[in-house]
Curated annotation (Swiss-Prot):
Family, as annotated: Belongs to the Dus family. Dus4 subfamily.
Database matches in Pfam families: Dus
Keyword set includes tRNA processing: yes
GO molecular function: flavin adenine dinucleotide binding; tRNA dihydrouridine synthase activity; tRNA-dihydrouridine20a synthase activity; tRNA-dihydrouridine20b synthase activity
Keywords: Flavoprotein, FMN, Oxidoreductase, tRNA processing
Protein name: tRNA-dihydrouridine(20a/20b) synthase [NAD(P)+]-like
Top EC class for this record: oxidoreductase
Organism (species): Homo sapiens (Human)
EC numbers for this chain: 1.3.1.90
Gene Ontology biological-process entries: tRNA dihydrouridine synthesis
Catalytic activity: 5,6-dihydrouridine(20a) in tRNA + NADP(+) = uridine(20a) in tRNA + NADPH + H(+); 5,6-dihydrouridine(20a) in tRNA + NAD(+) = uridine(20a) in tRNA + NADH + H(+); 5,6-dihydrouridine(20b) in tRNA + NAD(+) = uridine(20b) in tRNA + NADH + H(+); 5,6-dihydrouridine(20b) in tRNA + NADP(+) = uridine(20b) in tRNA + NADPH + H(+)
Length: 317
């Protein structure tokens, strides 16, 4: 686990409770947990463009607790990286609470992934299979609450919905009763992929909860974010692919501005972002502003210097 400043300094920076944002009455704009992508450099970028709260990529709690190598590779932060939620994949309350204790000085809270539909995750007892195990979810929340006594440290869950929405409402109410801080709802079932998001279901869940609820699914612009926020009555919206394509989305840009691309280059180079990640993010950002031929050329570039030369030649960056 890496940090660019002393633990005591980070603790001071983390004092603000994200819950306060949800109670402000304003739209809370959240960067989703994205495997490989929502790491420190990308979080730094989206924070420059009106993102209020960021999540780390999903981290397997068991590996994180047992392996120093996993901690060093999976979790990096710095003083400006807040408010921050660390998302864990877990199916064991003790291991999750151990992981939460490790990140507690460096983050504002942890989130339990109860929504990942990937086969490998569900086969391991992680992700979306947990929506069918409310007692296990409750146990994990309780254990973290008992083991981490830091004031304001949040414990949240991110879920998908059931075909029978009553089961989802029951899950959420049980989680709330156990002490969960807020719930993020992706408005699809575990079996659904590209079907329309059930925003009406998210609205019903919110109406049955006293804690904050975040809406998630198919939000590609600030206008869409504001619309989903209004129609669901939720406290915030979480965006994944929309931010990959346009990290400046929450600031109201319809497509990635050149300044954002330049900011990404600066941030990625400063933080030592691996080339593959650096390049992949640019491919997402430039999707809408490059022709098919330009994409072929840009996507084939194989070094940081080649990318910088390309951007300089084509965009004056």
């Amino acid at each position: 686990m890496k940090s660019d400043c002393m633990q005591t300094t980070i603790c001071q920076e983390r004092k603000k409770d994200p819950i306060e944002m949800f109670h402000s009455g304003q739209l809370v704009k959240v960067c989703a947990p994205m495997v490989r992508y929502s790491k420190l450099a990308f979080r730094t970028l989206v924070r420059k463009y009106s993102c209020d709260l960021c999540y780390t990529p999903m981290i397997v709690a068991a590996d994180f607790v047992k392996s120093i190598k996993a901690r060093d590779s999976e979790f990096t932060t710095n003083q400006g990286d807040c408010p921050l939620i660390v998302q864990f994949a877990a199916n064991d309350a003790r291991l999750l609470s151990d992981a939460a204790r490790i990140v507690c000085p460096y983050a504002n809270g942890i989130d339990i992934n109860c929504g990942c539909p990937q086969r490998w995750a569900m086969a391991e007892g992680y992700g979306a299979c947990l929506i069918n195990k409310p007692e296990l979810v409750q146990d994990m929340v309780k254990q973290v609450r008992n083991q981490v006594e830091t004031p304001g440290f949040s414990v949240s869950i991110k879920i998908r919905i059931h075909d029978d929405l009553k089961r989802t409402v029951d899950l959420c109410q049980k989680a709330e009763a156990t002490g969960v801080s807020w719930i993020t709802v992706h408005g699809r079932t575990a079996e659904e992929r590209h079907q329309p998001v059930h925003y009406d279901s998210i609205k019903i869940i919110k109406e049955n909860m006293s804690i904050p609820v975040i809406a998630n699914g198919d939000i590609r612009s600030l206008k869409e974010a504001e619309n989903v926020w209004r129609i669901t009555g939720t406290d915030g919206v979480m965006v994944a692919r929309g931010l990959l394509a346009n990290p400046a989305m929450f600031a109201g840009y319809e497509e990635t501005p050149l300044k954002c691309i330049w900011d990404w280059v600066d941030i990625a180079l400063e933080l030592g972002t691996p080339y593959m990640c650096f390049h992949q993010h640019l491919m997402y950002m430039m999707e809408k502003i490059t022709s098919r031929q330009e994409k072929r050329v840009f996507n084939a570039l194989s070094s940081t210097s080649a990318i910088i030369d390309y951007l300089t030649d084509h965009y004056g960056i």
